[in-house]
Amino acid sequence: MTGSHRQNGHREVLYIIACGSPLARDVGRLVELAQQDGWDVCVVTTPDGAKFVDRTAVARQTGHPVRTHYKNPGDPDVLPPADAMIVCPATVNTVNKWAAGITDTLALGLLVEAQGRGVPLVAVPYTNAAMATHPALQAGLARLTEWGVHVLFGDDVVPLHPPGTGERHQHTFPWARTLATLRPGCKEGPLVNASGSKGAPS
């Protein structure tokens, strides 16, 4: 283990929230790295994220069921409370809704509540160059950053690509860097916007 994610002898719990992107097929790689860092990992998907994630394989890997939908009234919680959350891959849809406080999916409800509880949050958008320039996304990322969410985004994370070519760039995705933001003493830089400049988008 390279991390020290333990409290009172128990492993701290990390939620990995996977959104609807082909990159979500590889979420098991992030799970493995997080487990090596000492986390007890749970995976939550958005409804579209569930289309890409092998739920059976991930449940076997984590020891927890993969959740997508709100539970029914009276049903018990099947996941332990989160000590930190990583949204990876984060889609434009989820970022925009999150920044607006919308909670129409389990993933968004968990994120909005976690922000109010002061849970450390990391967002790693994965999108194409055209969508990355949309004013709503730029404003949403700036708002999340202002609220204390650690956003990793831009050409120094994953080079932004033309529409329809995302799967060709998945092999370059820096899974380890994504997780490193939660390590004690991490000095990751500020958000990088779609143009590649430092600081929150304007």
Where are these regions (language model features)?
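A cross-family phosphate/adenosyl-ligand binding-site feature
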Residues: 1-202
